[in-house]
Structure formats: structure tokens, C-alpha cells
Amino acid sequence: MKYVYPAMFYKEEDGRYSVLFPDFDVATCGNDLNDAMNMAVECLALQLVGLKRDGDPFPVSSPVDTVDPVAYAEELGAGKPSDYFVNLISVDADEYAKLHFNKSVRKNLTIPVWLNEKALAQGINFSQVLQEALMERLQA
């Protein structure tokens, strides 16, 4: 499922961009606008995946017209920004997690010869059985 939240982009004096998400009180940055956009997607995805993992609710997305980058910057003590904008960032947190967090790792295991032979004879996928057993054990 896609989620959409507003992000405030501030251009820094050195040309880099700071990005703040008012609904989460998290921030990221990028070397240029393209990098900042990519980092904003990653930041939002990480935040949503973390909330979901912890069983915490997602905050309600603020309407774009209620987000005030000037007031937010002044509240942080940064003064009035000269170059800024608000943009909506959209991310499918589940899909992002699958692509970036659910990578497989190779594990070696030791089992008795007789068990190995029986499993091979039945065409059992060792990786799948191990994953299923671990998932079941971790949910218990």
C-alpha cells in the first residue's frame, strides 16, 4: 500500500538540500535535489517500516496547505529560509522493505546423513523449510 506524506525541502547555502517530515519529526538530506528526493523516499520508507515493525500506528498525513516551512524552520532556530518548497513523497513501504531489507543470506547447517537423504528423496527445499520453521518459532 502506498503512503503519502508532505516533506519540506530547504536549499542550503552550499547547494545541498535538507528534507524534513513534519508528521514524523525526522529529517534527511541530499547533495542535490535529485539525491534529496531519493533520500526523502528512503527516509519515509524507513520510518514507516519501523512503525509497522513495532506495531505503532502511522500518523495522519498533514494536508500540504497546512505545512508551513518558514514557521517550522524558525521553530527549529534556523531563521527564515530563503529557498524552500513542500512536496508530497509517496512510498509503498512493504515493497520498499522487500527490495531493501529482506535480502537472503547464505547459511550452512549440519544435519544427520539419514535426514539429508530422506529430505533429498522427497525433493524438500531446505531453505524454504528452514525459513518456515524460523518464522513459526519467532512468532511463538
Question: Where do the PLM segments sit?
Answer:
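Hydrophobic pocket/interface hotspot
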Residues: V19, A36, G55
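Short, basic amphipathic alpha-helical segments that act as recognition/interaction helices
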Residues: F126-A140
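Short, charged, surface-exposed hinge/linker loops at domain edges
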Residues: K2-V4, A45-N108, W114-Q122, A140
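A short, exposed loop/beta-hairpin motif centered on an aromatic-Gly-Thr core
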Residues: F24-D35, N108
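Short aromatic-glycine-(Arg/Gly/Cys) micro-motifs in beta-strand/loop hairpins
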Residues: F9-D23
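A short, charged, amphipathic alpha-helix used as a generic interaction element across diverse proteins
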Residues: D35-L46
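Amphipathic alpha-helical recognition patches that constitute DNA-binding helices
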Residues: D35, R106, N125, V129
